[in-house]
């Protein structure tokens, strides 16, 4: 799709409709709590990648990419798993960082390395694929925080995610009329089960007492996790020729991108409002946890440069919805923005060549986490390491100026 035809006003209406529907108000953390959480989770996550096993397995991965992933995922965990005990946050952060660092490895044809996977698993042998080598080591460390039901869902979702990546590397969008295919693939790779499993630690939630409520959350959580991400990703993925939920809908159902955006917005609102409505008269801590995740998830998307929502904010062709969009954007930045020097630190054994990120450049630096560039002259999926450092600094400077009062610009 041509970015010149992007329906900016319609997209603003969609974001505003969604944030209105959930009554967006992220009161999860104070600024000081965000800073403390980011410092701890980021430093411990980075330290993991200095250990011998990940160093050996990931020796072909650029340190700059690993650094970008640890920053992005640390943000994600602290903002969305805000009520989780700190050490559990660290282990969830490592779990998701492994997934994202190895995303390219999964997306290359894994059939050969997976030939003996199940027999090796059953017989307790070392797996061959690097994804499973690292998880064979880390999963016991993660699962110690959870009861058996949550742990089972974390494991189930980990297998699902790998399968989803395996399918996605073929870039197959489904046949016309295969109306179940888009949602099937999205459920596999959205990590909803891992979110629901990791958000309820055994130290704070009694699985036996809350089993019915947890089961219901497991059934409902894929929608908020997947669809919120798809809604906030709609702009940055608009001109990319890749299979995703929206483009798959267009292929199998024969609808336009505008129609797909309307469906996506309606489905996202339904998924989030429904899960909160179901829990409103249930365990108050469970409701607070899910509400905190949804509102923190919105804040994280707006604060993360990879979603490029500042570009929408700065457009001059927005209609009435543009003002409301900017209000919500500013609200999220005010509560969620943390400058890099407030929380990053050097981790011994984890040195990255080149200039260290400083100030607001951190969010642009994070652009490598999922392989997207924030170079505004080239919107496509390109490697951060090969992109223009000057372009990133210029983009970050424009962003910072955009969020400051006009008198300071």
Swiss-Prot record:
Its EC number is 4.2.3.-. Its cofactor is Mg(2+). Pathway: Secondary metabolite biosynthesis; terpenoid biosynthesis. It comes from the Eukaryota. Mg(2+) 2 binds at residues 229, 233, 237. The fungal sesquiterpenoid aspterric acid (AA) is a submicromolar inhibitor of dihydroxy-acid dehydratase (DHAD) in plants and is effective as an herbicide in spray applications. Mg(2+) 3 binds at residue 241. Keywords: Lyase, Magnesium, Metal-binding, Virulence. Mg(2+) 1 binds at residues 103, 168. A motif (NSE motif) lies at residues 227-237. GO terms for molecular function: trichodiene synthase activity. A motif (D(D/E)XX(D/E) motif) lies at residues 103-108. A motif (WxxxxxRY motif) lies at residues 316-323. GO terms for biological process: sesquiterpenoid biosynthetic process. Gene3D superfamilies: Farnesyl Diphosphate Synthase. The conserved active-site motif D(D/E)XX(D/E) is required for coordinating the divalent metal ions that stabilize the PPI moiety of the substrate. Terpene cyclase; part of the gene cluster that mediates the biosynthesis of the sesquiterpenoid aspterric acid (AA), an inhibitor of dihydroxy-acid dehydratase (DHAD) effective as an herbicide. AstA cyclizes farnesyl diphosphate (FPP) to produce (-)-daucane. The cytochrome P450 monooxygenase astB then converts (-)-daucane into the alpha-epoxy carboxylate intermediate which is further converted into the tricyclic aspterric acid by the cytochrome P450 monooxygenase astC. Belongs to the trichodiene synthase family. This is Terpene cyclase astA. It comes from Aspergillus terreus (strain NIH 2624 / FGSC A1156). The gene is astA.
